[in-house]
């Protein structure tokens, strides 16, 4: 490794070329990073500073040629070098366009910092980017026209620097001088000696932070020989990246890798640990080569992006993807990835895939209507693949959902009906989704919901006119309060502003009113001459019956379900009386128990033979009753606990009743706040 301190001029000077490897991300610095760089330049000049450190550029020297251009492969610092190159292009162009200003020589910039003057072809350029960025940068260097429709951060940032230079806050010569004061450490590695991957990971860049998917791409491709690297990139990695939306690519790909790992590992990696988890997976995975792994990633990326971007040649599946998107069902993706692959491999049919998508959508939607907390859904779907029986695929999935209880339950028709009739639908985020599906169910000419607005049949105005008060009866205030935003009182119209607070009969008979409406949602209304509580309830029942058809409960017979119903074993039932409490320890326990149970309605208490367990999916804390105190086992690694007060003990590898590597004691009721700070960390970890 050779590290030298210099500036962009010393780095670029000479017959050199800096190349960006195919695995590096596109140029991604935005205006904020450019503003920071420009402000540093202005600040140095105005305050007469001698220098300002802006970071490092790490490269690998390619095999040197006796003559010609010495080439360097950049492994870190692409963004910084590209941005400085854009600034130099803008400064050169200003000098060319303002010939009377002779304070700097544009040829010096052009021939020494942007081009290798006596070379031809690609070797003519000091910096060569990848893919689309490559052509755009070359066109900027050569001052060639670029299509007006071209969207690129290179152009945006170049234009920013042009605007700043033209403000004349600094003279061109001052800008050139300040650029030279930007200090850069240039680190050149020896491919035969230095571990480029390890060095890359250890760098603490001050630029735009690499995403987890950036790190994974570099990890996969950096260590390969050039030919294999290009093959993997062109045949697998680049096609995979093109499936993702460009502007949001990093974020969506990070989520893809997390969901891919969740599917493979059957546990959910933390978002900021995806890269580390992927490295461990790669070491232990079933694939014998990088190509096989990347081929698998490409396959699952296709399923993933089809769902995210609602793409499928099958119209019904495409509509179901739209439902998944509307309901924000990303938590189901790890399971759905597995199901899509089984469909591709003919384990299940396309009809089975459609049915599974519908079951998952109904599960999430019914729970939403019944206001069941969603924080356990990710773990429910992550582990669902374990429940699939290949020889009874569909029934095993249906049985899994039907047999859930408590916070994992699939609300049955009775629970769903009660909630759907009385729920405040209007203030739900999914209200348009609900109304459009009720309208379009089995409709050969579906409407576009965006062409309509939601209408309250009984108006929202708390000061109702006399006609409405008369129709609703003497308890009109109670009726309005109870039913205003419920499904029975909501419909769609293209004439919301015209209807306003008008009496029901006017809304019915007016131009564009309910009587003229072709919407199925309004078919019940056209038979009426008034609107009251009974009509609201009756219409709600009709719409709820339809909702039960749209979002169906899984159909499985008792015979099909029987193999999945495990008979309850005759086990000893424990209770509070099991434990050797005295008055003091009983008080300690009651104080702690109340605080733990108040964490969430999802928390369940279970009495075991030797301890009391508190769990969401698994135990997050266990309490053992001792003679004069409570011993508490917290289900976390000791290295992960935050314990500024030092009340925890490391019991890693030591046999104790309960779960986890952290032990804490509660000796007095006054200890409860400190103890809960530790317990809450374990609870939140399980929530993630």
Spans of features found by a protein language model:
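Glycine- and hydrophobic-rich flexible loops that cap the catalytic core of alpha/beta enzyme folds
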Residues: 2-268, 511-518, 522-529, 533-536, ...
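Betabetaalpha-Me/HNH-type nuclease active-site subdomain
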Residues: 43-46, 51-70, 385-525, 529
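Secondary-structure capping and boundary motifs in well-ordered enzyme cores
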Residues: 67, 73-80, 176-179, 188-195, ...
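A cross-family structural signal marking well-folded subdomains
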Residues: 212-216, 221-432, 531
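Short, conserved charged micro-motifs
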Residues: 346-349, 640-644, 670-677
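Solvent-exposed, charged helical/coil patches
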Residues: 567-592
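Short, conserved beta-strand/beta-arch hydrophobic-aromatic motifs that form part
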Residues: 606-662
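Well-ordered alpha/beta subsegment
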Residues: 654-688
């Amino acid at each position: 490794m050779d590290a030298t301190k210099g500036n962009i001029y010393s780095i670029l000077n000479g017959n050199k070329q800096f190349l960006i490897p195919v695995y590096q991300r596109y140029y991604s610095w935005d205006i904020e990073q450019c503003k920071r760089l420009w402000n540093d330049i202005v600040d140095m000049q105005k305050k007469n500073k001698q220098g300002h450190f802006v970071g490092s550029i790490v490269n690998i020297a390619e095999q040197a040629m006796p003559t010609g251009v010495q080439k360097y492969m950049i492994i870190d610092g692409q963004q910084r070098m590209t941005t400085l190159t854009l600034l130099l292009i803008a400064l050169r162009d200003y000098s060319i366009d303002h010939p009377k200003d002779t304070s700097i020589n544009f040829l010096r910039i052009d021939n020494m910092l942007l081009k290798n003057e006596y070379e031809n072809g690609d070797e003519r350029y000091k910096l060569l980017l990848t893919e689309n960025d490559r052509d755009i940068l070359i066109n900027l260097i050569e001052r060639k026209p670029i299509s007006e429709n071209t969207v690129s951060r290179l152009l945006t940032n170049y234009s920013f620097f042009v605007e700043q230079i033209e403000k004349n806050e600094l003279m061109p010569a001052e800008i050139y001088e300040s650029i030279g004061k930007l200090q850069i450490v240039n680190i050149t590695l020896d491919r035969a000696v230095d571990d480029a991957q390890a060095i890359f990971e250890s760098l603490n860049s001050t630029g735009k932070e690499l995403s987890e998917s950036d790190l994974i791409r570099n990890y996969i491709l950096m260590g390969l020989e050039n030919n294999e690297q290009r093959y993997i990139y062109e045949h697998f990695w680049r096609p995979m990246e093109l499936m993702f939306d460009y502007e949001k690519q990093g974020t969506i790909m990070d989520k893809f890798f997390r969901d891919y790992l969740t599917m493979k590992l059957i546990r959910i990696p933390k978002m900021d640990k995806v890269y580390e988890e992927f490295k461990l997976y790669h070491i232990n995975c079933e694939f014998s080569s990088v190509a096989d792994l990347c081929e698998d990633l490409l396959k699952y990326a296709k399923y993933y992006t089809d769902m995210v971007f609602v793409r499928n040649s099958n119209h019904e599946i495409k509509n179901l993807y739209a439902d998944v998107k509307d309901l924000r069902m990303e938590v189901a993706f790890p399971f759905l990835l597995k199901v899509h692959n089984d469909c591709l491999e003919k384990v299940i049919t396309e009809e089975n895939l459609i049915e599974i998508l519908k079951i998952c959508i109904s599960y999430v939607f019914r729970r939403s209507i019944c206001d069941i907390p969603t924080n356990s859904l990710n773990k429910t779907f992550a582990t669902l693949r374990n429940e699939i029986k290949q020889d009874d695929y569909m029934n095993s999935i249906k049985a899994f959902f039907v047999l859930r209880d408590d916070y994992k339950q699939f609300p049955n028709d009775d629970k769903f009906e009660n909630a759907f009739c009385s729920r405040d639908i209007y203030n739900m985020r999914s209200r348009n989704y609900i109304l459009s599906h009720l309208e379009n169910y089995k409709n050969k000419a579906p409407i576009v919901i965006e062409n309509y607005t939601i209408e309250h049949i009984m108006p929202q105005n708390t000061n109702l006119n006399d006609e409405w008060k008369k129709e609703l009866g003497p308890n009109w205030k109670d009726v309005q309060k109870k039913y205003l935003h419920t499904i029975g009182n909501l419909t769609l119209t293209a004439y919301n502003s015209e209807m306003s607070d008008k009496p029901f009969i006017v809304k019915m008979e007016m131009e564009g009113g309910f009587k003229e409406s072709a919407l199925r949602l309004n078919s019940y209304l056209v038979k009426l001459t008034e609107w009251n509580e009974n009509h609201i309830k009756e219409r709600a029942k009709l719409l709820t019956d339809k909702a039960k058809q749209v979002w169906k409960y899984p159909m499985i017979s008792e015979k099909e379900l029987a193999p999945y119903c495990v008979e309850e074993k005759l086990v000893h039932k424990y209770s509070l009386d099991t434990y050797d409490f005295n008055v003091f320890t009983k008080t300690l326990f009651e104080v702690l128990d109340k605080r733990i149970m108040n964490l969430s309605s999802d928390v369940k208490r279970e009495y075991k033979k030797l301890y009391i367990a508190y769990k969401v999916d698994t135990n997050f804390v266990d309490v053992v009753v001792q003679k004069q105190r409570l011993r508490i086992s917290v289900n976390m690694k000791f290295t992960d606990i935050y314990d500024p007060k030092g009340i925890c003990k490391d019991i890693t590898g030591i046999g104790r009743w309960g779960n986890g590597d952290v032990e804490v004691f509660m000796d007095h009721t006054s200890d409860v706040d400190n103890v809960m700070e530790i317990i809450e960390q374990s609870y939140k970890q399980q929530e993630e």
